[in-house]
C-alpha cells in the first residue's frame, strides 16, 4: 500500500491525522525500496471544532493545519487522510467469485440499497475483494466501505484552501491495519529471525484518541479483526480521577 502511495511521481507524502483535539502529521519520502520519516508535527485545535467527527469550527481547524504546514518546512503538498465515526460504514458482502472487478462494481451498485442504509447519491462507496469465502462456496468476500459525502467534501475543501492536495482518503481503522501489515513485512525483509517469527503471530494495535479508541488485529498479512469505540482519553481520564 505505502509503495503504491509513494510512486515515482509522488516522492513525498504527508500523512495527516485530524483528531478532535489535535492535528498530527508525518512527512514520508520514498528512496528506492525504503520509506524514510523526514518530519513530524503536532498542533492543537482551539476550542471544540468537532461535533461527532463533523467539522463545526472551520477556522480553528484551518489555523491548526496552517501551523502543521509551516512546521513540516517542506514543499510537499500531497496528503493522505482517514475518517472514522458513525458516518463511516464497513460491511462484509458475498458476491459471485467469477465476476471481474468492473462487474463486481456494477453488482455492488445494483445491490447498494440492501447493503448500505443510505442513498447512493449521498455517499462515497469503495470496495476491496478479500478472497474466497469459507462459508459460502463459489462466493468471494468483499469489504464495502461507505462514508457520507459531507464528511469527505468538507475536509477536502478545507485542505485545498490551506494548500494541500488530498491524494488518499481512507478509513482510519483500516489505515491502521495496513500500516501494521506493511511494517511487519518490512521487518521480515531484514532477515531478522525474531521479525520473521513475529509476522507469524497475531499482531495488534490500539489507537487511543481524545474521543475514540480503535483496535485492529492482523495475522500473516491479513486483517483478522477491527473495532471502533466512541470513547477515548477524555472518558478514561475522567474515570481515573
What are these regions (language model features)?
Residues 1-111, 153, 165:
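Non-catalytic, solvent-exposed interaction/assembly segments
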Residues 6-8, 135-138, 189-190, 194-199, ...:
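Solvent-exposed alpha-helices and their adjacent loops that cap or buttress functional pockets
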Residues 12, 39, 140, 211-213:
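Envelope-exposed proteins and targeting segments
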Residues 16-23, 84-86, 197-200, 205-213, ...:
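A short acidic Gly-Thr/Ser loop motif
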Residues 39-41, 168, 225-227:
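A structural microfeature
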Residues 78, 82-188:
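Active-site neighborhood for divalent-cation/phosphate handling
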Amino acid at each position: 500500500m505505502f509503495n503504491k502511495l509513494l510512486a515515482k511521481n509522488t516522492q513525498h507524502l504527508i500523512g495527516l491525522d485530524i483528531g478532535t483535539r489535535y492535528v498530527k502529521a508525518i512527512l514520508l519520502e520514498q528512496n528506492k525500496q525504503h520509506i524514510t520519516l523526514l518530519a513530524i508535527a503536532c498542533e492543537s485545535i482551539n476550542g471544540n471544532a468537532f461535533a461527532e467527527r463533523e467539522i463545526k469550527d472551520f477556522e480553528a481547524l484551518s489555523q491548526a493545519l496552517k501551523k502543521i504546514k509551516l512546521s513540516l518546512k517542506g514543499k510537499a503538498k500531497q496528503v493522505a487522510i482517514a475518517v472514522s465515526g458513525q458516518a463511516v460504514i464497513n460491511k462484509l458482502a458475498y458476491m459471485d467469485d467469477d465476476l471481474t472487478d468492473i462487474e463486481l462494481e456494477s453488482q455492488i451498485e445494483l445491490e447498494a440499497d440492501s447493503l448500505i442504509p443510505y442513498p447512493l447519491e449521498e455517499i462515497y462507496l469503495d470496495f476491496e475483494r478479500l478472497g474466497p469465502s469459507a462459508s459460502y462456496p463459489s462466493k468471494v468476500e468483499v469489504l464495502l466501505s461507505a462514508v457520507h459525502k459531507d464528511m469527505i467534501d468538507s475536509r477536502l475543501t478545507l485542505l485545498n484552501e490551506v494548500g494541500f492536495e488530498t491524494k488518499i482518503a481512507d478509513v482510519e481503522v483500516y489505515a491502521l491495519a495496513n500500516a501494521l501489515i506493511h511494517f511487519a513485512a518490512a521487518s521480515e525483509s531484514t532477515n531478522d529471525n525474531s521479525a520473521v517469527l513475529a509476522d507469524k503471530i497475531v499482531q495488534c494495535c490500539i489507537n487511543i484518541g481524545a474521543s475514540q479508541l480503535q483496535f485492529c488485529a492482523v495475522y500473516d498479512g491479513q486483517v483478522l479483526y477491527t473495532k471502533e469505540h466512541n470513547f477515548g482519553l477524555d472518558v478514561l481520564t475522567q474515570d481515573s480521577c
